[in-house]
Amino acid sequence: MSMARIMRGAGALLALQLLLGCSGPRLPSPLPPPLAEAAPQVHECPAGLAAGTRCLGGQDSAGAFYLIAIPRDWGGVLVLHAHGGPELGPPKAERAAEDLKRWAIMVKAGYAWAGSTFAQGGVAVSAAAADTERLRQIFVTHIAQPTTTILHGQSWGAGVALKAAERYAAPGQPRPAYDGVLLSNGVLGGGTRSYDFRLDLRVIYQYLCGNHPRPDEAQYPLWMGLPAGATLTRADLAARADSCLGLATPVPKRTPEQQARLHTVVNVLQIPERSVLGHLNWATWHFQDVVQKRTGGLSPWGNIGARYSGSIDDAALNAGVQRYAADARAVTQFGLDSDPSGRVGVPMLSVHGVYDATAFVELESQLRRTVVAAGQGDRLVQTFSDDGEHSYLSDPVYPALMAELLGWAGRGEKPSPASVARRCQAMEARFGPGCRLLPNYQAAELESRVAPRQRP
């Protein structure tokens, strides 16, 4: 190793010592720095973090930005965060700051937190899992070896967390990278099942509105999202959706035709008005990302055999929507990258808002089926909350989940939905109100929410 590299490593260690200060926690000695990853640098903490928090940040060798936060009285537990989305386009450092600010409760609860922006924009689950593990290695190498590492996946990031756990904490792995997995409002059905309803939205919207694409525009199969090189903007699509459905129009000013069409979309797909445009956006630009960059121009989704109900005239709707068959090669390729296998060898604890309109609560049943089929059903406990928000539930619920998961991972004390609910109530004294857990709730099958269909 060159003297310059040794000096850079020594400088990084000195910076960390200065960051923590004489009165800060005494951390284990860092391991020798790897050749590929530079040490994180002192970084300004986002507003709202607990007093005394120290932050570091950087950009990894793959190009992902990251932030790390260490509370004043760190007890050795690291929460490794996989964010939702995903974002399209190149990574932006601001994303890591936004995530840390949103999940400041983890730092307030005494845990170190680390989150990556992911190096590759778009629906690339396995690549994001590798980015997440790379950040863990940066933490271990340059900061400390945590006593316990919990992998936390939120929304789309839950699929990232599952993929990372399958790869780095599989059953029988002698030294798993993670001690437990926390999943919150997760997209848990993988890419080949979680997005079926968004194809349904595209075909139903086009049947009703006929403006995405318009008749005078180049026609394309709707599973494509958009053709390569298309110039449609989000503002353009929002204007088209408002023209047809009245999404941005006050209810009293909507025409009867707009209201009827919107009523069909909401009733058939079982989604609220407020989520229609977001799902339509995803089924446009994220579908484009998947088809153009992940499946070689082939469709991983289809709606052959799907029977839509809830409209004024179901027979006309089912006869009139466009129908597509999923391509077996695309399903296999996209599934390998994005579908969970369930082969996770450490405890998994999930929470899901039962009225989540972004990631349906019924996805929890799909996860349960997958994990049980892999022989790991005893490693999964699922909890549910009386919430409709997707991005964040409430402050006390996450420390409660963490405490229960740590007891399971460290002492073998497997939680139950009831024990998590009790713990949450106890946490309200410290973290404020917000416990709405439903210990007796069970999620229905995904097919009760999304029309079953033929699959390759």
Q: What is each PLM-predicted segment?
A:
Residues 23-25:
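Bacterial signal peptide processing site
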Residues 18-21:
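C-terminal motif of bacterial Sec signal peptides marking the signal peptidase cleavage site
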Residues 251-285, 289-295, 386-456:
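Alpha/beta-hydrolase-fold serine-hydrolase catalytic core, especially in secreted/extracellular enzymes
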Residues 73-74, 135-155:
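Gly/Ser-rich "nucleophile elbow"/oxyanion-hole loop immediately N-terminal to the catalytic nucleophile
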Residues 76-85:
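Short beta-strand element of the alpha/beta-hydrolase
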Residues 148-209:
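Primarily recognizes the serine-hydrolase "nucleophile elbow" in alpha/beta-hydrolase
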Residues 28-46, 187-338:
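Accessory cap/linker subdomain of secreted extracellular hydrolases
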Residues 344, 350-352:
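Short beta-strand/loop motif that positions the catalytic acidic residue
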